[in-house]
């Protein structure tokens, strides 16, 4: 344990031992400014600060050994923050230190304010004096109480006040010097926060031109930050939200080659700025020595040679990486040994017999499949697949197996392109397509991937004429797939299909259903209505698209969809509500407006504003309610049919455990979820509508069977 750690551990719990060790520390021949600053800041906020204040002068000999720098000034400022003796020696030292400001017009007044003129009490004098000298129009400060960055708009040494405009406050604030000493910290004009607040447009342009420099500035001024924290500091303030992902990806690539930013090992760890810079090879050495995991060592070497290929121009660096890789004890013909061989061969010019065609051809089908799945580096997976294709007679079987099982689209692309060129493999894939059309859940990820390619015309399997019909068959299967996976672990695949189908204003669907038969379109509309991913608006668009293709699909009575079903009781209640809105609340509101107008100036009249806003709300409510009443149709016994689920029906659902629930389907005015009365437009009701006894519905992720349908009048 070094001095810093020992002193920090003794500070609170063993003060007497701390002061004994401090005496020993003062005799150090080598002084670290960073270490001294950390220690003094800890002391300043600790319980021993008053006691240490009496011996604060003991820091001066250590301070004198430091080279001239901001670091040295910081140490002395901390000494004066802690000291309590106000000795003559310290006074002389302080006066000498502030002499650099003597050309300032407020120099003498500042001496008086911080206590250096009379020399009686001058704790904190250097920090306070530096702040006073910084208080000039156009400079920036940071408010410790939550107001953020501020720009100085004016200062009066006579009144001892400063006027500051803060980013977190609507109006400029007058702050006394006494408060400023406690709450404000000076910011240089090139500080990250000052640049972001002072000229955001110029800072955004700079960030787009040199993203690494901006992140260096951020980390240097604000300290280590992880990716999420960096995003919070930049997005919306420097980089617009819509541009963030692209900008950040570009910045990350460039940061890998920056010797001042140490990248984290995980997303939760911070990026660290090192002003002195570091050696990439030393960073690799540290990474390799700190791990016994062969997989991690190979990954570290791969990242190094991929991102920092220029470092390999130094032969010593190249030989170091080769030596480290060859020293790994790996089983032959394993995924790790194959990765090492590829790394040595492709990046380091050290060819390995392990990659010879003879050796690849000797591997069994299961061995090759296992190696591909256990190679962690994607580019090496692709390279090994190319070797299998070139060298192994069993490549078709291996590629087919990978096509059916992999979740990596890049690998699926590679094996698919190779397979469709081979006649037998192509026939096998066509058989798999037919099987997936019948059972899309047979190979769910492959089905979704292939459907997207077929619709986009990028499958390479079908002719233009065949693709149209296959696309329609696959669309029907896709809708069935979306319905079945909605509440399953594969629901993300359903969301992916949904995004594709509704994208570009339903372009894929418009292309597929073009010139389709009326029977197909009826099935299409029915299947889409069962997919919970589609909103009511989506379903309306899908029906409209189908009706454009086959106008005969249009309902005989166009108004049917627009009917708002209601019971007679609810109809009477809503008419009474409309009368109340028109005859009472609007009249009362008119009086409110007149009363508020009588109060005077309408620009500053909040009562008038609120009254007008209430009038607008009432008018909108009256408009909507009037429209609904005009569309309303009272539900009668003759309008309810129980051969399938519809409005006015009571439906008994039975789950897989045999438990039953009864739901009533009525219009939106009568809906009451607590009493299990559903609106006809609700998701569950729409899931049930049109179905008959014995059919299943998906509710809360579970299957329920329709056991009974009856009328509300039964």
Curated annotation (Swiss-Prot):
GO molecular function, one term: RNA polymerase binding
Pfam family, one: GreA_GreB
Domain GRAD1: 1-502
Gene3D superfamilies reported for this sequence: Transcription elongation factor, GreA/GreB, C-terminal domain (3.10.50.30), Transcription elongation factor, GreA/GreB, N-terminal domain (1.10.287.180)
Keyword Transcription regulation: yes
GO biological process: DNA-templated transcription elongation; regulation of DNA-templated transcription elongation
Region (GREA): 561-714
Entry keyword annotation includes Nucleus: no
Entry keyword set: Coiled coil, DNA-binding, Transcription, Transcription regulation
Coiled-coil zones: 602-639
Disulfide bond entries: none
PANTHER family according to UniProt: TRANSCRIPTION ELONGATION FACTOR GREA (PTHR30437:SF4)
NCBIfam families: PRK06330.1
Role, per record: Necessary for efficient RNA polymerase transcription elongation past template-encoded arresting sites. The arresting sites in DNA have the property of trapping a certain fraction of elongating RNA polymerases that pass through, resulting in locked ternary complexes. Cleavage of the nascent transcript by cleavage factors such as GreA or GreB allows the resumption of elongation from the new 3'terminus. GreA releases sequences of 2 to 3 nucleotides.
Family, similarity comment: Belongs to the GreA/GreB family.
Protein name: Transcription elongation factor GreA
Organism: Chlamydia muridarum (strain MoPn / Nigg)
Lineage: Bacteria, Pseudomonadati, Chlamydiota, Chlamydiia, Chlamydiales
Gene name for this UniProt entry: greA
């Amino acid at each position: 344990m070094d001095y810093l750690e020992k002193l920090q551990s003794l500070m609170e719990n063993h003060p007497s031992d701390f002061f004994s060790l401090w005496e020993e520390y003062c005799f150090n021949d080598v002084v670290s400014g960073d270490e001294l600053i950390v220690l003094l800041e800890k002391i300043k906020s600790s319980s021993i600060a008053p006691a240490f204040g009496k011996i604060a002068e003991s820091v001066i000999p250590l301070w004198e050994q430091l080279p001239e720098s901001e670091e040295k000034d910081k140490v002395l400022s901390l000494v004066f923050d802690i000291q309590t003796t106000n000795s003559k020696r310290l006074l002389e030292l302080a006066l000498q230190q502030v002499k650099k400001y003597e050309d300032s017009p407020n120099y003498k007044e500042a001496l008086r304010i911080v206590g250096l003129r009379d020399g009686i009490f001058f704790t904190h004098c250097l920090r306070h004096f530096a702040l006073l000298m910084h208080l000039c129009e156009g400079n920036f400060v940071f408010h410790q109480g939550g107001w953020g960055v501020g720009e100085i708009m004016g200062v009066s040494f006579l009144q001892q006040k400063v006027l500051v405009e803060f980013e977190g406050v609507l109006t400029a604030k007058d702050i006394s010097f006494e408060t400023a000493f406690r709450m404000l910290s000076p910011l240089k004009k090139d500080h990250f926060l000052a640049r972001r607040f002072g000229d955001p447009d110029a800072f955004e342009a700079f960030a787009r031109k040199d993203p690494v420099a901006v992140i260096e500035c951020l980390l240097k001024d604000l300290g280590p930050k992880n990716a999420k924290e960096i995003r919070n500091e930049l997005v919306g303030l420097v980089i617009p939200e819509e541009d963030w992902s692209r900008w950040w990806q570009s910045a990350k690539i460039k940061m890998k080659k920056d010797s001042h930013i140490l990248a984290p090992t995980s997303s939760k760890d911070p990026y660290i700025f090192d002003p002195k810079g570091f050696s990439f090879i030393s960073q690799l050495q540290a990474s390799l020595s700190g791990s016994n995991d062969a997989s991690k060592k190979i990954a570290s070497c791969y990242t190094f040679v991929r991102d920092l290929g220029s470092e390999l121009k130094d032969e010593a660096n190249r030989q170091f990486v080769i030596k480290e890789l060859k020293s790994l004890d790996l089983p032959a013909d394993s995924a790790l040994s194959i990765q090492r061989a590829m790394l040595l061969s492709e990046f380091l010019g050290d060819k390995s017999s392990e990659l010879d065609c003879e050796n690849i051809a000797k591997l069994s089908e299961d061995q090759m499949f296992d190696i591909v799945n256990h190679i962690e580096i994607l580019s090496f997976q692709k390279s090994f697949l190319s070797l299998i294709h070139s060298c192994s007679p069993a490549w078709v079987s291996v590629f087919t197996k990978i096509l059916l099982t992999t979740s990596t689209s890049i690998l699926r692309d590679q094996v698919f392109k190779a397979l469709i060129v081979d006649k037998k493999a192509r026939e096998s894939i066509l058989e798999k397509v037919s099987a997936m059309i019948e059972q899309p859940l047979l190979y769910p990820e492959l089905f979704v991937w292939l459907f997207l390619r077929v619709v986009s015309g990028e499958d390479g399997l079908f002719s233009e004429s065949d693709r149209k019909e296959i696309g329609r068959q696959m669309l029907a299967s896709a809708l069935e797939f979306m319905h079945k996976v909605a509440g399953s672990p594969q629901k993300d695949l359903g969301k992916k299909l949904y995004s594709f189908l509704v994208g570009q204003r339903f372009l894929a669907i418009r292309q597929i259903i073009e010139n389709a038969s009326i029977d197909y379109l009826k099935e299409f509309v029915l299947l889409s209505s069962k997919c919970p991913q589609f909103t009511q608006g989506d379903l309306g668009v899908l029906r409209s698209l189908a009706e454009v293709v086959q106008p005969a699909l249009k309902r005989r009575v166009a108004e049917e969809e627009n009917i708002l079903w209601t019971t007679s009781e609810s109809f009477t209640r809503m008419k009474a509500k409309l009368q109340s809105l028109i005859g009472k609340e609007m009249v009362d509101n008119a009086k409110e407006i007149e009363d508020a107008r009588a109060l005077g100036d309408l620009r500053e009249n909040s009562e008038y504003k609120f009254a007008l806003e209430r009038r607008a709300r009432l008018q909108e409510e009256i408009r909507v309610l009037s429209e609904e009443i005009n569309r309303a149709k009272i539900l009668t016994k003759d309008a309810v049919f129980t051969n399938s689920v519809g409005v006015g029906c009571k439906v008994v659902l039975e789950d897989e455990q045999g438990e039953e629930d009864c739901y009533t389907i009525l219009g939106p005015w009568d809906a009451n979820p607590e009493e299990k009365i559903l609106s006809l437009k609700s998701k569950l009701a729409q899931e049930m509508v049109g179905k008959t006894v014995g059919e299943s519905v998906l509710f809360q992720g579970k299957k329920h069977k329709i056991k009974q349908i009856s009328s509300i009048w039964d």
